[in-house]
C-alpha cells in the first residue's frame, strides 16, 4: 500500500517537468483505480480457487513491473501505463491478502486478520506519502530513489511469498471463471449493505488526499515547503491506523457511529481550512477525518469478516474494495475535470462539502441502527437482515437497518470486543 501513495507527493514535480494540468493528475490517479477494479472484478476471487500464494506471487511481480516503469518514466504516457499496471497488481493481491490474513487469525483472536488489514493499509499509505514527501524536499529526483528501491523490495517480497505456507486447498475439478462480476453470498449481504454508506464516505476523503492534496497545499494554502503535501497525506493515514486499532475496542455500531462523527467534523475542518486558508487547520482536519476513516473501515471489515466462509472470503472482500475504490476515484476524477473551470479552491471546497454530506448520511444510517451485539449484527430474528436485503433489491440502494436490541452483558453494559 505504500506504493499506492508514493506517486502523490511527486505529482507537482511531474507537472513542472512535463507541463500537464490538475485534470491530468486526476486521470493518472483514476487509471490506477480502473486497473484495480478490473482486477478485483475478475481476479479478486481467484485465490479461493488457486490458493493464496500463487496469486500473491503474480501480484508482486506485476507491482515490481509497475515501479520499474515509474523508475524509467519519460512522460505522462509512462505514468498512465505504470499506474494502470500498479492498479492491476493491487487488485490482484488485495482480496487474497485480506482473506489470507483472516485465514491466519487464531480462534482466540478472530478479528486479528481484519484489524491487520485495515491498520496495515493505513500505515502503508502513510509511510509511502511521508517518506516520498520528505524526499521531494531533500533531493532533485525523488522518483529515481523511490521507485528503484520499491522495485527491489517487491522482488524480495516475491521470494518470501514463494516460501509462504498455503492456507487454502484448491477444490479439485472446479473451473476458474474470470467473468467480471461481484457476488455477495446471501449470508454476508445484510452486513455488506449496512457498511456501504460509511465505506463511501471514508474512501471519498481518501481520494481527495491522494489525488489533490499536494496541489491544494501548494496552490490553495500557499505552502511552498515541498514535503507538506506528503506529510498531510501521512497524517490522514496515520490517524486512520490509530482509529482502526481503536475500533477493535468497540462494537461495530459504536465504532462506525464514532467514525462517522469524526468524518463529519474532519470534513468541516478541511472546508474551513480551504476557506481561510489555513495549513494548520487543514492538517488538523486531516487527523480528525483520518481517525474517522479508520474507525468505520476497520469496524465494517471486522463485521463482514465474521459472516464469510473460507470459500467466499476473498470474493466478499473484493466486493468491499470495489465499493471503496469506486468512492476513492470517481469524486476525485470529477474534481479534476471541474477544477479548470471552477478553480482549485472552489472545487476542493465543494469536494469536502460532498464528503461531509456523505459522512452525515453514514451517521444517520448508523444512528438508526440499534445493533449492539459483538459484531453489530441484529440479535433478534433474521427478519431485520431480510428486510434490509429486500429493500436494497427494490431500490438499488442500502436501506436503513431494522432496529433490534441485543441483550446486554451481565452488568447491563452493551457487549464489547477487545
Tell me the role of every PLM-derived stretch.
Residues 19, 51, 72-77, 273-277:
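Helix-breaking motifs and short loop linkers at transmembrane-helix boundaries and internal kinks
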Residues 77-86, 280-288:
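Paired small-residue
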Residues 303-344:
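A late C-terminal transmembrane helix in Major Facilitator Superfamily
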Amino acid at each position: 500500500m505504500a506504493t499506492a501513495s508514493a506517486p502523490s507527493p511527486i505529482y507537482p514535480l511531474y507537472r513542472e517537468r512535463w507541463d500537464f494540468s490538475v485534470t491530468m493528475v486526476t486521470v493518472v490517479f483514476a487509471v490506477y483505480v480502473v486497473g484495480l477494479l478490473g482486477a478485483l472484478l475478475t481476479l479478486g476471487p481467484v485465490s479461493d480457487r488457486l490458493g493464496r500464494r500463487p496469486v500473491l506471487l503474480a501480484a508482486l511481480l506485476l507491482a515490481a513491473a509497475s515501479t520499474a516503469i515509474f523508475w524509467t518514466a519519460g512522460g505522462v504516457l509512462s505514468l498512465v501505463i505504470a499506474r494502470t499496471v500498479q492498479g492491476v497488481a493491487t487488485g490482484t493481491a488485495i482480496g487474497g491478502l485480506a482473506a489470507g490474513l483472516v485465514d491466519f487469525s487464531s480462534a482466540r483472536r478472530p478479528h486479528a486478520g481484519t484489524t491487520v488489514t485495515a491498520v496495515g493499509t493505513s500505515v502503508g499509505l502513510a509511510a509511502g506519502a511521508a517518506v516520498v514527501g520528505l524526499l521531494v524536499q531533500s533531493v532533485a529526483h525523488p522518483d529515481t530513489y523511490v521507485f528503484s528501491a520499491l522495485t527491489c523490495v517487491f522482488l524480495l517480497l516475491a521470494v518470501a511469498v514463494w516460501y509462504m505456507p498455503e492456507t487454502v486447498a484448491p477444490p479439485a475439478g472446479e473451473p476458474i471463471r474470470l467473468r467480471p462480476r461481484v457476488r455477495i453470498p446471501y449470508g454476508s449481504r445484510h452486513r455488506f449493505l449496512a457498511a456501504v454508506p460509511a465505506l463511501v464516505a471514508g474512501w471519498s476523503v481518501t481520494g481527495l488526499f491522494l489525488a489533490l492534496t499536494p496541489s491544494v497545499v501548494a496552490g490553495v494554502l500557499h505552502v511552498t515547503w515541498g514535503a507538506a503535501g506528503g506529510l498531510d497525506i501521512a497524517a490522514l493515514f496515520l490517524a486512520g491506523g490509530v482509529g482502526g486499532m481503536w475500533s477493535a475496542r468497540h462494537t461495530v455500531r459504536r465504532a462506525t457511529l464514532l467514525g462517522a462523527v469524526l468524518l463529519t467534523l474532519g470534513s468541516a475542518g478541511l472546508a474551513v481550512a480551504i476557506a481561510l486558508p489555513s495549513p494548520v487547520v487543514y492538517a488538523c482536519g486531516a487527523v480528525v477525518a483520518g481517525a474517522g476513516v479508520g474507525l468505520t473501515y476497520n469496524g465494517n471489515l471486522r463485521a463482514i469478516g465474521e459472516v464469510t466462509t473460507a470459500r467466499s472470503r476473498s470474493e466478499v472482500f473484493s466486493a468491499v474494495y470495489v465499493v471503496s475504490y469506486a468512492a476513492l476515484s470517481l469524486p476525485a476524477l470529477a474534481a479534476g475535470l471541474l477544477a479548470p473551470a471552477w478553480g482549485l479552491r472552489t472545487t476542493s471546497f465543494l469536494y469536502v462539502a460532498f464528503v461531509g454530506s456523505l459522512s452525515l448520511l453514514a451517521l444517520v444510517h448508523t444512528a438508526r441502527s440499534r445493533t449492539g451485539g459483538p459484531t453489530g449484527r441484529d440479535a433478534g430474528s433474521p427478519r431485520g437482515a431480510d428486510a434490509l436485503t429486500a429493500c436494497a433489491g427494490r431500490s438499488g440502494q442500502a436501506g436503513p437497518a431494522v432496529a433490534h436490541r441485543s441483550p446486554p452483558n451481565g452488568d447491563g453494559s452493551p457487549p464489547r470486543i477487545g
